[in-house]
UniProtKB/Swiss-Prot annotation:
Catalytic residue list: 114, 231, 286
Database matches in SUPFAM superfamilies: alpha/beta-Hydrolases
Any one GO CC term of the record: lysosome
Protein's name in the database: Lysosomal thioesterase PPT2
InterPro entries: AB_hydrolase_fold, Palm_thioest
Gene: PPT2
Family of the protein in this entry: Belongs to the palmitoyl-protein thioesterase family.
EC number from the UniProt entry: 3.1.2.2
Role noted for this protein: Catalyzes the cleavage of thioester bonds from S-palmitoyl-CoA or S-palmitoyl-N-acetylcysteamine (unbranched structures) but does not have activity against palmitoylcysteine or palmitoylated proteins, branched structures or bulky head groups. Conversely, hydrolyzes both long and short chain fatty acyl-CoA substrate.
Keyword Disulfide bond: yes
Top-level taxonomic group: Eukaryota
Origin species: Bos taurus (Bovine)
Signal peptide: 1-32
Alphabetical UniProt keywords: Disulfide bond, Glycoprotein, Hydrolase, Lysosome, Signal
Length: 305
């Protein structure tokens, strides 16, 4: 009468099937929620006279900003044991990180503080199957140390930096981790001949593994270098960025170092592919790098994918 379309009622058969259809919908699995890729595991290596406890703030920051991240702060060579020869430490840390890497199919990140940064760089050299994405070197003397610090005065109370080479460049001295990266710019020949660690991982002295170590190091996804002028321990502080003194104690930046110009272990190649990040920050003392929130947010968090 009003020209409206006729409405048809559901058939009896449909009404009978309706409860079963509703039950079927309830039993079907729900559509999965959008999945965000998990953060890569983070491995932390401490420095001289240090332990895992020192990194409680860093652990807190990572848990807050990247919840669910598996963070392992390695508890090896703590306290005075950190004075053990660095190659001995490298072997110990290698045994600890290998199973973590093996389980992390997407790779891992390394955060390595002070002396630990040298341990980690050696790990990247000797491990031919490592899968490190970001190696974050946190105030580490990557080109060596040449300065009077409280640590040195405690260990060698009768020596000054000008004559410490007499101890460090002896077989006895090389049994101490500090001497493994002592780099006296006034006695370069002695350093090159006597250094059992730094001169080798830098490729400054020929050895049978140099080519393989360079290849291994270049498996690295990204090298993040962190340090600053108010560190107070790393001397020169530019060593954190692969800068160092010449014979006149003038600091030459990384790009003027022979290890870079010769690309002896891969620095030049990394820089050419845009894989080196430099993050200098003033106002932070050596023992505060791993607890400074601003430093974490600026220089560390962006590289923890």
């Amino acid at each position: 009468m009003l020209g409206l379309p006729e409405r048809r009622l559901p058939s009896a058969e449909f009404l009978l099937l309706l409860p079963f259809l509703l039950l079927l919908l309830l039993l079907l699995p729900a559509a999965p929620a959008p999945h965000r890729a998990a953060y890569k595991p983070v491995i932390v290596v401490h420095g001289l006279f240090d332990s895992s406890y020192s990194f409680r703030h860093l652990l807190e920051y990572i848990n807050e900003t990247h919840p669910g991240t598996a963070v392992t702060v390695l508890d090896l060579f703590d306290g005075r044991e950190s004075l053990r020869p660095l190659w001995e430490q490298v072997q110990g840390f290698r045994e600890a990180v290998a199973p973590i890497m093996a389980k992390a199919l997407q790779g891992v990140h390394l955060i390595c503080y002070s002396q630990g940064g040298l341990v980690c760089r050696a790990l990247l050299s000797v491990m031919d199957e490592h899968n490190v994405d970001s190696f974050i070197s946190l105030s580490s003397p990557q080109m060596g140390q040449y300065g009077d610090t409280n640590y040195l005065k405690w260990l060698f109370p009768t020596s000054m930096r000008s004559n410490l080479y007499r101890i460090c460049y002896s077989p006895w001295g090389q049994e101490f981790s500090i001497c493994n990266y002592w780099h006296d710019p006034h006695h370069d020949d002695l350093y090159l001949n006597a250094s059992s660690f730094l001169a080798l991982i830098n490729g400054e002295r020929d050895h049978p593994n140099a080519t393989a170590w360079r290849k291994n190091f270049l498996r690295l996804g990204r090298l993040v270098l962190i340090g600053g002028p108010d560190d107070g321990v790393i001397t020169p502080w530019q060593s954190s960025f692969f800068g160092f003194y010449d014979a006149n104690e003038t600091v030459l930046e990384m790009e003027k170092q022979l290890v870079y110009l010769r690309d002896s272990f891969g620095l030049k190649t990394l820089l050419a592919r845009g894989a080196i990040v430099r993050c200098p920050m003033a106002g932070i003392s050596h023992t505060a790098w791993h607890s400074n929130r601003t430093l974490y947010e600026t220089c560390i968090e962006p590289w923890l994918s």
